[in-house]
Amino acid sequence: MESWEKPKNRSPGHIIHPFKLLALGGTGKGKSNSLKNIFLKHQSSSKPFQKLYIITCSEESTEWDDCEPTELYVDIPDLEIFDGEDKTCVIIDDFETMKMSKDQYRKLATMMRYVCTHRNVSCMLSYQSFFDCVP
């Protein structure tokens, strides 16, 4: 179990796993860059993530390639891939939630409410609208 006490020199950017993080802000305000920096801070620690899943709105997106993701998705994947064995990070980057199907919305809600707390998953989500984000 991770804690703020060990190691004593823990950086504020090395958030205790598992966690949920929501980054809200307009276009070009540094949301994705902040999420990448938090991920990289974990990777430089003694307990890095073993898996990284990126969920984004474009299959052509290359901005996360330098983080060597395990998989890149354009839809919320089946939640069975999160088996709880490996320390996992999911980054949902500027994913459009208003046009999601009911099944996709259900998967996202289950991921945020259950998977992040019971399956060894930390989830970071960036979104551009303060008013339309997932509850």
Protein language model regions, located:
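Pre-Walker A adenine-sensing motif
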Residues: 1-15, 36
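Conserved P-loop NTPase motor cores
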Residues: 7, 21-41, 57-61, 73-135
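Short secondary-structure boundary/capping segments within folded domains
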Residues: 13-14, 43-46, 80-82
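Pre-Walker A (Motif I) flank of P-loop NTPase domains
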Residues: 15-21
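Post-Walker A helix-loop "phosphate-sensing" segment adjacent to the P-loop in P-loop NTPases
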Residues: 40-52
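Short, well-ordered coil/turn elements that cap or connect secondary structure elements
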Residues: 47-49, 67, 85, 118
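Conserved substrate/cofactor phosphate-moiety recognition/catalytic segment
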Residues: 51, 58-70
